[in-house]
Amino acid sequence: MSPRASTTDLLRRTALRMFVDQGFDAVPVTAIAKAAGVSHMTFFRHFPTKEAVVVNDLFDPLIAAAVRAQPRQWRPLTRAVRGLVAAISEEPAREEMSSREFYERVRLAALTPSLAAAVRTAGQETERAIAAALVVPGVDDAAARAAAGAVMGAASSLLLAWAGENNAPDAGATSTATSTTGDAATVLSRGLLSLLGES
C-alpha cells in the first residue's frame, strides 16, 4: 500500500470511528486530522470535504463497464439493472459491501440528512457513466439518462433504507453486516430486479 493510500485509509478509519461515536455533525475536520496525527491541510489533500470520507467510492464508476457488457438489444432499463446486479455480484464488490466499514458508512448516511444527499450526489458520476454506456443505435440520450437515473436512484434509496432499518452487526461476532433481510448486495440485487418485475 502506498503512503498516500495508507494515509487515506487512516483518515477514513479515524473519521468513521469518530462519526459513529460522536455523530457526523459533531466532529470537525480539525479533530479528525488531530486524531490521525496529520494536519487539517493533509486531510483536504485526501478528501475534498468531510462528507467525502463517508460517500466517496460508494458507487464504483466501473459499474458502467458491466452495463456496457449487457446485450445491446435489451431495453435501457434492463441493461442498467442487469449490469449493476452483475457488478455487485462479483466477489470484490460483495466482500466490500459485507464489510463493517461499508455498513457504518451507509448507516451514517442513512441517519444524517446532509450525508444522504451527498450519497445521491456522489452517485451522479456513476449515473452519467451508466447513461453513456446505454447509448447505442436505437436508444436516445433521454432514454439512457432516465434508465441510469432510475437505477442509481433506486440503488441509493435501497442502500439507505437497508442501513437505516438494521442494527449494527455484533462487533465480536463477525466483521460483516447482515440482517434478516440479507446483506447489502442481496438487498440491492433483489430491489433492483423488482424494477424489472422480478425478485
Regions found by a protein language model. Name each.
Residues V38-F47:
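Short hydrophobic/aromatic patch on the recognition helix
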Residues R120, V136-R190, L196:
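Hydrophobic/aromatic-rich alpha-helical bundle segments in the mid-to-C-terminal region
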Residues A64-R105:
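Hydrophobic alpha-helical connector segments
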Residues R13, R82, A86, E125, ...:
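Short, residue-level hotspots on alpha-helical faces of the histone-fold
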Residues M1-Q22, A26-V38, V55, L62:
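Basic, helix-initiating cap at the start of DNA-binding domains
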Residues L108-P137, R145, G149:
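Amphipathic alpha-helical packing segments from all-alpha helical-bundle domains
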Residues K34, P48-T49:
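Residue-level detection of the helix-turn-helix DNA-binding "recognition helix"
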Residues E51-V53:
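A secondary-structure capping/hinge motif
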